[in-house]
Regions:
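HotDog/MaoC-like acyl-thioester-processing domains
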Residues: 1-12, 102-103, 113-159
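Alpha-helical membrane-targeting segments
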Residues: 1-30, 52
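Short structured motifs
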Residues: 29-35, 92-98, 119-121
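Catalytic strand-loop segment that frames the active site of acyl-thioester-processing enzymes
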Residues: 30-60
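Active-site helix/loop of acyl-thioester processing domains in fatty-acid/polyketide metabolism
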Residues: 63-83
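Hydrophobic beta-strand-centered segment that forms part of the acyl-chain substrate-binding groove
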Residues: 76-115
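A generic structural signal for short beta-strands and their flanking turns/coil linkers
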Residues: 31, 41-43, 85, 90-94, ...
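Residues located in well-ordered beta-strands
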Residues: 34, 95-97, 109-111, 135-137, ...
Length: 159
């Protein structure tokens, strides 16, 4: 089993993911983020509306939505980083559009796995940094888009 597959198997185990989040991303753990799917192509993360994620307007606080959107792209990046030589990853940009009040369970999907893998391959081959614009779209239980986040990741192979 390659390193990316081993990483995917670990984080898709609910208990191991909770331990990872408790240790490395405690706010994500407190907010109740869950990884529903992780493939080389896409990741799906959910965040519930609850006491710890609410804002004064009876919807999910925008920073909690950003955390879920970032995890959907970041967990893919972590998986692809595991697949080869060491590389660093960093968020260098974030934009968001909000189109509807976020209540209930919000599901973020980020389909940018192939672009992340390509940027990492190029960085490992050239030693130069590469950026990827990942789009993480959040939908509510009715399937309506509530937010679209554009997260710019920078990848650089370590020497």
């Amino acid at each position: 089993m390659d390193k990316a597959a081993a990483f995917r198997q670990q984080v898709l185990n609910p208990w191991k993911l909770r331990l990872f989040m408790l240790q490395k991303l405690p706010m994500a753990w407190l907010a109740g983020l869950r990884l529903r799917e992780l493939t080389p192509e896409r990741a799906v993360v959910t965040i519930p509306f609850k006491y710890l994620t609410q804002n004064p307007f009876h919807s999910i606080y925008f920073a909690c939505l950003a955390m879920a959107a970032e995890l959907a792209s970041g967990i893919q990046a972590m998986m692809h980083v595991q697949s080869g030589a060491p590389a660093s990853m960093l968020v260098v940009g974030l934009e968001a559009d909000f189109s509807k009040k976020a209540v209930g369970l919000i599901t973020f999907t980020c389909p940018n796995g192939p672009q992340i893998a390509q940027a990492l391959a190029e960085s490992r081959a050239t030693g130069e940094g590469h950026t990827v614009l990942c789009t993480s779209t959040g939908v509510d239980e009715a399937g309506d888009v509530v937010a679209v986040f554009r997260i710019t990741w920078s990848f650089r192979a370590k020497r």
